[in-house]
Curated annotation (Swiss-Prot):
Attaches a formyl group to the free amino group of methionyl-tRNA(fMet). The formyl group appears to play a dual role in the initiator identity of N-formylmethionyl-tRNA by promoting its recognition by IF2 and preventing the misappropriation of this tRNA by the elongation apparatus. This is Methionyl-tRNA formyltransferase. GO terms for cellular component: cytosol. The keyword Cell wall biogenesis/degradation does not apply. It catalyses: L-methionyl-tRNA(fMet) + (6R)-10-formyltetrahydrofolate = N-formyl-L-methionyl-tRNA(fMet) + (6S)-5,6,7,8-tetrahydrofolate + H(+). It comes from the Bacteria. InterPro entries: Fmt, Formyl_trans_C, Formyl_transf_N, Formyl_transf_N_sf, Formyl_transferase-like_C_sf, Met-tRNA-FMT_C, Met-tRNA-FMT_N. The keyword Transmembrane helix does not apply. The gene is fmt. GO terms for molecular function: methionyl-tRNA formyltransferase activity. (6S)-5,6,7,8-tetrahydrofolate binds at S110, L111, L112, P113.
């Protein structure tokens, strides 16, 4: 079976790696991001890809930066058939990509050339797209610009979040990769150059983009909430403090209340947004609290507001 160096970090990559292992590919090395300390207690957190690799006793490399590292020198000596990446999170040196005997292949979470970059899944939700998908592509020096070997589309439902799409696309990407790799060996793989006129970029989500503001319609705010679930979460400022919203739904009825105002807190919590639109909050997280459904919030803090109160700070 073909030999592989695999590079990936989150669960998206872990699902792909597990598929390669189960199909009998010879995994020569696994490269993932360094362990992180998370939370108030600074607990050391390993990536999902590292956990999968250790479970199967595979050699793991975790350079802070692959370029110019000692780890890179070791990896260059392996010369595998394939170098495969799935949500690794670093640029790869061209000389390393060229060390693959057959091809350097990436599993990308969008229908390229739409959404090159680090947050393709988030942008598909943020922009209200009706479909997304995965692309199996050649890795080249320029980010996500290589030829396309295979693509498969996936509908986006109104209930989907980035989290649910990550899960769906990891399985779709795994299956499409495993379907495509044998075509390299038997010579039936096809390649299609990307149309540079149709390129759309999806840079990593910035801190400024996390905030729900008064210029957004209910639909736009809901798209942001879905796009940033499960991480980092969308928020607005309420009484000078962050108030995260994990789940909401836009209502069809219009209101005359100005944007950012409480429309009702009787059995449900509805706020007005731009253009007279209304957003019903379903799952929230006030600063210093755990996530809660809106019923629990209305039984406590949420009951103290009066219809017409300003909820979203400027």
């Amino acid at each position: 079976m073909s030999s592989v160096i695999f590079l990936g970090t989150p669960n998206f990559g872990s699902v792909v790696l597990q598929g390669l292992i189960e199909q009998g590919y010879e995994i020569k090395a696994v490269v993932t991001q360094p362990d992180k300390r998370v939370g108030r207690k600074q607990v050391v957190h390993q990536s999902a890809v590292k956990e999968t690799a250790l479970k199967h006793n595979l050699p793991v490399y975790q350079p802070a930066k692959l370029s110019g590292s000692e780890e890179l020198a070791e990896l260059m000596k392996i010369e595998p058939d394939f170098i495969i990446t799935a949500a690794y999170g670093q640029f790869l040196p061209t000389k390393f990509l060229k060390s693959a005997k057959v091809a350097p292949v990436n599993v990308h979470g969008s229908l390229l050339p739409k959404y090159r970059g680090g947050a393709p899944i988030q942008y598909s939700v943020l922009n209200g797209d009706k479909e997304t998908g995965v692309t199996i592509m050649e890795m080249v020096k320029k980010m996500d610009a290589g030829d396309i070997f295979a693509q498969k589309a996936l509908p986006i439902t109104d209930e989907d979040t980035s989290g649910t799409l990550f899960d769906k696309l990891s399985i779709l990407g795994r299956d499409l990769l495993l379907e495509t790799l044998p075509k390299f060996i038997d010579g039936t793989v096809t390649r299609t150059a990307q149309d540079e006129d149709k390129v759309v970029f999806s840079p990593n989500i910035s801190k400024d983009q996390e905030k729900i503001n008064l210029s957004m319609t209910a639909k736009e705010a809901n798209n942001l909430i879905r796009a940033l679930n499960p991480d980092p979460g969308a928020y607005f400022m309420l009484g000078g403090k962050r108030f995260k919203v994990w789940k909401a739904k836009p209502l069809t009825e219009k209101t005359s209340f100005p944007a950012g105002t409480l429309v009702t807190n009787k059995k449900k919590f509805v706020i007005s947004m731009a253009d007279g639109s209304q957003l019903e909050l379903l799952e929230v997280q006030p600063t210093g609290k755990k996530k809660m459904n809106i019923k629990d919030y209305l039984n406590g803090q949420g009951s103290h507001f009066t219809i017409g109160d300003k909820i979203i700070d400027e």
